[in-house]
Amino acid sequence: MLGLDTNVLVRLLIEDDASQTRRARKLVDTAIAEQETVLVSLSVLLETEWVLRSRYEVPPETILGLFRAALEARELAFEDEAAVEEALFNWQDSQSGFSDCLIVAHHRQLGCRSTATFDVYAARLPGAFKA
């Protein structure tokens, strides 16, 4: 299994550096050719959202589209994919940030009855409440 770091995933999504994008694509293609899983962890996904939003000023709806396309890409596997899908679904209609949506969704997938939060917007997510 090959795990991707945030900077590699960002290159694959944004393609802003031709040399690094080629190298990232080659890494993934080689892993796939060798029948390896290419994994995107939850922490990498969270950091990627932060980098895209803060460094590249990518709007949330564009990030949502990029993440959905990555989920549909057969060459990538995601840690707790069900939670990622749920988080993206909740994020599209929420005032909460992606990280809050993913935290609540991941907790649900782990079997938590709910997520306690002091965040007013996160408390509005399905499966969360204001502590």
Per-range role (PLM):
Residues M1-V40, R55-T62, K130:
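Short, well-structured N-terminal submotif of metal-dependent ribonuclease cores
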Residues Q35-E36, S96, C112:
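Short, high-confidence coil segments that cap the C-terminus of an alpha-helix
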Residues T6, E81, D100-C101:
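Conserved glycosyltransferase catalytic-site signature
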Residues D5, V40-S41, S96-G97, D119-V120:
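Histidine- and aromatic-rich ligand-binding microenvironments
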Residues L42-V44, G65-D93:
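Acidic catalytic patch
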Residues V104-A131:
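Acidic, PIN/NYN-like endoribonuclease modules and their adjacent C-terminal/linker elements
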Residues L9, L45, A122-A123:
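A generic structural signal for short hydrophobic patches within well-formed alpha-helices
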